[in-house]
Amino acid sequence: MLKNGVISDTAKRAIAGMMKLAPSITAFGNMNPTSYLRLVPHQEAPTNVCWGDRNRSVLVRVPLGWASKTDLCKQANPNEQKSAYDTHQKQTVEMRSPDASANVYLLMAGLCVACRHGFSLKDGLAVAEKTYVNVNIHKKENSKILKKLDTLPDSCAASAECLQKQRKVY
């Protein structure tokens, strides 16, 4: 995920795939009608198709906390011994829309397909750049950025339609 302490182009391509397939991924990650009660603007759960690092207003968050040379495990658990592993290469991403109704097997398979799709996109890096957000998109001063972003489906039926439209990728 990281190259010289920054997110790599390979990781950006994987994220681009997640951005492209985010609408249909909700069909696997939000499988009942009540799931969509939390997917409303200005709540903790994301509603817009975007990503960022250390940003809780985005759909795919790259924490980047592991990118530092600090042993975060040791910081969080002071009574533990220092990790013997080089943790700065242990980068993660978070897809923040799924909830407890998710079919974890279909969701993980969908995310894998999305990453693979991102690797094959000719414009993958451009997609990643276009959907990258480094501000809280819910603040009033960032409303122009918010308006440029696609939104996630707002119901099971809308998610199913998105899955139907993108089914060839799967």
What name fits each language-model region?
Residues 2-170:
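C-terminal accessory/tail domains of diverse enzymes
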